[in-house]
Amino acid sequence: MALTLGIVGGGQLARMMIAPAVELGVDVRVLAEEPGMAAALAATATGDYRDLETVRAFARGVDVLTFDHEHVPQEVLRALVADGVRVHPGPDALQFAQDKLLMRARLAGLGMPQPEWARVTDAAGLQSFLDEHGGRAVVKTPRGGYDGKGVRVVADPEEVADWFDCGELLAE
């Protein structure tokens, strides 16, 4: 009996997972957000990955559930795990992909090598980081960025003044 893999998200990573899975004899189901997505030809369902009931219905009949992006809400994945759905990687791992500051703190706690970084919450904090690190930094929004969105190379805190309202930034 073949294993059935459910992939939440119909983007490029889902598309890249399909062929190797099929070669291994794995049946693949895809929950795409809309019909025009990269993996839409293999999609067996279309719906909102943020809606628990949509994802719950999709997960029925799959042996393992995964995702092709980090934007699936923690509460959705945790509810599925509580329902007995095998989710891999699990919500505890996903949180580090969802929050760059959390990831940096975890890597630091493990003693892993990484670039110098700081959590900054205002222009003064960013200016201090710039002064200590050669006057330029890569600044990232901790959540929601992808494919260059939420990333700026800056030499002045004013270049990210519009981002400080999100509460905290990652400076590297």
Q: Where are the predicted features?
A:
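Short acidic/polar capping segments at secondary-structure boundaries
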Residues: D122-G125, R143-Y146, P157-E159
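ATP-binding N-terminal substructure of ATP-dependent carboxylate-amine bond-forming enzymes
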Residues: M1-L102, A124
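CheY-like receiver
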Residues: A57-F58, R106, S128-F129, D162-W163
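Glycine-/Pro-rich loop/turn segments that contact NAD(P) or position catalytic residues
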Residues: Q95-R136, V151-V154
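General beta-strand structural signal in soluble alpha/beta enzymes
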Residues: F67, V87-P89, E116-R119, V138-T141, ...
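Structured helix-beta-strand junction loops
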Residues: L24, G61, D83-G84, L110, ...
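Conserved ATP-binding module of the ATP-grasp superfamily
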Residues: P113-P115, R136-V139, G150-E172
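Acidic/polar active-site rim loop that often engages polyanionic ligands
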Residues: V85, R106-M112, K140-D147
